[in-house]
């Protein structure tokens, strides 16, 4: 087994699939709850989400029903919340890294959770073009067999969020500004030029094959032992 694959097995990997925005086009709209169940974490009890008042307080500030910051459903937000709590409780060394930021909702949730656990010394690295998603390649085919390039043309406006807007959203959390690192540009150009030495939690949400592959090649080796890797759209694209 190649070294990268061996190391892969040593880490906790949270694989969540399905991105809501990818089913809003080309007549793919369907009942969200029934579609989500096919990809749900079988170990996740929804009652836990409702009963967890600390999570609900944070989710109310970033969740899709309360704001414009994220399209992630409550289950995925809770997975991220629990992952952040895990790395703090287990004293996993390293910073928080997100590739593919959109409006900053997931990063805001991470920041608020870190603050809840008095962990504001960790840096949060946010990689994005802040000008929209780069054009998909022929490898980017979704679970319905639809070339993502076709959907991308419809989504371009939705996916385009400026750096200034994300900075404003992140600032609203109260997390120390000096510990929020915004890295603007395509990840193929910015990584590994600007990267932390160690990563406690790596969240990948750039959707596309080429960018995700590049991120894993350069950032995965920096994930601390027993750290967390979240691939947001794992299973949604054939690549």
Give a label for each model feature.
Residues 78-92:
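Conserved alpha-helix/loop element of class I SAM-dependent methyltransferases that forms part
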């Amino acid at each position: 087994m190649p070294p990268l694959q061996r190391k892969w097995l040593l880490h906790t990997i949270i694989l969540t699939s399905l991105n809501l925005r990818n089913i809003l086009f080309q007549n793919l709209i369907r009942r969200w709850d029934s579609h989500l169940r096919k990809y749900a974490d079988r170990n996740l009890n929804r009652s836990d989400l409702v009963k967890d008042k600390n999570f609900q307080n944070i989710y109310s500030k970033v969740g899709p029903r309360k704001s414009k910051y994220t399209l992630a459903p409550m289950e995925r937000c809770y997975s991220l919340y629990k992952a952040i709590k895990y790395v703090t409780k287990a004293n996993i060394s390293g910073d928080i890294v997100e590739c593919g930021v959109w409006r900053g909702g997931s990063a805001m949730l991470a920041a608020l959770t870190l603050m809840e656990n008095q962990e504001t010394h960790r840096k949060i690295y946010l990689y994005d073009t802040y000008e929209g998603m780069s054009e998909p390649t022929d490898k980017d085919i979704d679970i319905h067999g639809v070339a993502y390039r076709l959907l991308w043309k419809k989504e371009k406006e939705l996916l385009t969020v400026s750096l200034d807007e994300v900075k404003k959203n992140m600032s609203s959390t109260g997390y120390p500004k000096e510990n929020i690192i915004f890295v603007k540009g395509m990840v193929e150009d910015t990584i590994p030029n600007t990267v932390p030495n160690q990563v406690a939690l790596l969240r990948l949400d750039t959707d596309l094959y080429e960018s995700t592959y590049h991120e894993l090649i350069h950032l995965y080796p920096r994930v601390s032992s027993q750290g967390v890797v979240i691939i947001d759209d794992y299973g949604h694209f054939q690549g």
